[in-house]
Amino acid sequence: METRTEPTPSSTVPGGASQSIVIAIAGSGGDGVALMGDLLLKMAAHQGLYGMLVQSYGPQIRGGESAVILRVGDREICYEGDDTDLLVCFRASDLKRFRGSIHLHERSVLVMDEKDEGELPEWLGHGGREAYRHPFATFDGGVEVAGDPKNMMALALICRALGWSEALAEAAMRDCFSHKPALVDRNMPTFRKAFARTDVPALASLKGHGVPLFVETGNEAVARGAMAAGLQFFAGYPITPSSEVMETLIEELPEAGGRLVQAEDEISALGMVVGASFGGVPSMTATSGPGLSLMTEMMGLASMAEIPAIIVDCQRAGPATGMPSRTEQSDLFHAVFGGHGDFPRAVLGVFDVVHARDVMFRAFELAENYQLPVLVLSDAYVAQRRQIRDAVVDRRDRPQRHRWSSPADGPTRFSLTIDQPANPFRVPGTPGGTYMAAGIEHTEEGNPSADPVTHQRMSEKRFRKLESIAADTRTWVRTLGRADAPRGIVAWGSMYGVLQEWAAEHPEYRVFMPEIIHPFPLEAFSAWRKGLKDTSTVELSFQGQLHRYMAGLTDMTAVRSIARSGGLPMSKRELAELLAAPAVAATKE
């Protein structure tokens, strides 16, 4: 085998000269691609390395091509990188689905099966390089081996390339299959043989901190963040890509004294949440776009009756069924404006796995304090990624609802003269606190009313909550880059990872990322944009929903809209091309 120069890792983690390595594995259903990604991420975490794993798969229930992209480094990572340092591909034909997800640089290492004669796609960027050929099904002389030869050999060669030991791999396997030790015993001999005989170039060495770190998905972080914030009741209906929120809570919420119900549909799920919250219990549901559509009328009920309710929306691409396993940022309009009639709600966005816990605290704080629905917008890219993070020890106080205890706390449930954004909440069963909560317009006592003057005054009362929220959350933003940089980017949600690295590598840019989307932090935005030469909004939405939403709040005529449909997250390479391209129009109105 010819000698090749040691590959240079393709990406630098923000904050200095820290290096990271990007590995991709592509195969078909049954090849164990996802399992290998999970095992490698566990190995990184065991050493105190940081990392991030994203999966790419189709909407089919079983089978089809799948790929994982793993990036590991010695600092926190929330973007998978542009170029792959090591690609393991079981069949060239498996790569056809992953255009835009996997790209090689000039010194990448490519490993393929020795019997595969398929042609690599030009978009891969392989430049005609010769692949390292390995016998994924058999070893020297065609001798069959025990276990699953294909993925065990691939795992072994990746460990060799990274300089990771057999013991580390075995520890990760036993951790992953603690309930099936015999499975590990059956596969380890295969791994050891492959590890001893595999010949692959070494990648740059990465040294971890030595203290094991914690692996968590975005959905798991949302679930655990909600529990830490005081969640006691969850009702939901499974839907990709949010299902893991409920799956996590099924295992963990009852142990914390909470209750969970799998409802018959999304309408029922939010109805149960509103009912439980009416009973004084902090409650939440999680869904995706189609489910959010069904929940919208019930959102209006929560707002009209002034009942706290948390709705987590893990966005998928497209309307209707759309692309269930793909990401997009196209539910912003629905979250901010969806529903008949005028009713207030707050909307938050999730940046990454680490941020997800903080967002859930903020969501419960707003819901409990202001007694209204709060929507938390995640998406498939954040929800289903696996990210290595530091262990969490949360000592924050849980948000507490201001409860009514006696007439001294206010004469009526919906008093118009109270000095605070929301009236003290009357929990059913509190002596003297009986009232009617309904979706119909009502008087201060909760009695039905069709009086236009009452409707106007109650609407003003409900919407004053947004004024108070805007004042209390004006610092809920994150800015990246130099404060005096001449060029600006405005984005939200899962764009955070790529823009964090973009700002670190391009000092001419500053970035504005609101944690709260509605009400929008206009005061912070106005201060941030001063002195900018040019500004762009960047988002995964065909309509440019963020840009259009902001145009209704402030002058955006000089701000360029960079927007495309979702499906794939935006890379630094694509971002560079879009920012360099001539502007088609100054604004989208």
Where are these regions (language model features)?
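Active-site cofactor/cluster-binding pocket
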Residues: 2-229, 233-235
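Flexible, low-complexity linker and terminal segments
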Residues: 8, 215-219, 227-229, 359, ...
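Thiamine diphosphate
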Residues: 18-99, 240-337, 346-367
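Short gly/pro/ser/thr-enriched loop/turn and capping motifs at secondary-structure boundaries
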Residues: 58-61, 117-120, 139, 243, ...
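Short beta-strand segments
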Residues: 89-91, 111-113, 287, 310-313, ...
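A short, gly/pro- and small-residue-rich
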Residues: 97-117, 306, 546-563
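Gly-rich Lys/Arg/Thr-decorated short loops/hinges at beta-loop-alpha junctions or inter-strand turns
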Residues: 177, 196-210, 226-231, 249-256, ...
